[in-house]
Amino acid sequence: VKRLLIGCLLTSLLFTLPAMAAADAAEGDVIITLGENLTEPQKQKVLEEMNAPDNAQIITVSNAEEHKYLDGLIPRAQIGTRAISSAMITIGAQGSGLDVETHNITWVTKEMYTNALITAGVKDAKIYVTAPSPVSGTAALTGLMKAYEVSSDKVIPDDVKKVATEEMVKTAKLGESIGPDKAVALLAKIKEEMANNPPQTDADLRALIEKVAKDLGITLTEEEINSLISLFNKMKNANIDWNQVNDQLSKAKDKLSAFLQSEEGKTFIQNIIDILKEIWNAIKSAFSSSEPQNNQ
């Protein structure tokens, strides 16, 4: 349990701290994607919420584009018939990494977006995802990738878009059974291992998944393992820059280590330890109070 708590804590920190990378677009460029079916009042509300600059480039995302990447991954009813998810991408300085924030997104966590965007090759950007009312958040990734292509003048290969979307959805589904933080940790660690030592066969891939899950204290069903084997086989065959993925993960770890050695990091860790102690003491107290008392 202690190992698992530490692993989840480190993974949360890994994705909270910006993953370092490089970008070609100009620092400060802002691209906004608006769902095509937003009403005018909703558009204005979203833009105000984003504090969008007047010179921001605005593009729209259609429901058809959302279905292109999500069909077959989640029920069509969940995708819906209206595109309302919106996002703002602000290009950061070289090496600033990814910083994702969300609002009204109920199923996909910001760490899941970060992990999927790394797979898609998105880097060095501050990202804000929102909707006028609570939504699952699955459709937003389509807009994010489209906006990044416009801002960076780079094309994300279609097979990479599809596998990044599948990664996001499968991580969210897995999060329902093992918890979102554990799901993100599992997928990130498997990708790191694949970048360093690509498995050659399905048996190798299964062994890798089972080993990483065991190391993180996670129990997977046979169905979940097979689903992950399918996902990572698609990643192996997609046009993914594994050197970049590995580089971002390595630099993020270096940044995490520096943070943990800083006064801010030490204070943060101590606060976590204090909270865990309080929880443990509360549990002990609850068990003690529930023990039968002997009458004297």
Regions found by a protein language model. Give the residues of each.
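Terminal amphipathic/targeting segments at protein termini used for secretion
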Residues: 13-25, 99, 146-149, 203, ...
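Soluble oligomerization/assembly scaffold segments of membrane-associated complexes
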Residues: 118, 123-218
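Solvent-exposed, polar/charged alpha-helical surfaces in well-ordered, non-transmembrane soluble domains
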Residues: 44, 111, 115, 142, ...
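N-terminal, leucine/charged-rich tether regions that mediate assembly and partner docking
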Residues: 22-126, 150-151
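Sec-dependent N-terminal signal peptides of Gram-positive bacterial secreted proteins and lipoproteins
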Residues: 1-22, 276, 280-283
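Charged, long alpha-helical assembly modules
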Residues: 218-296
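Second-shell loop/turn segments in exported
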Residues: 30-34, 98-104, 127-134, 172-176, ...
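Soluble non-cytosolic domains of exported or imported proteins
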Residues: 37-41, 103-111, 134-142, 154-159, ...
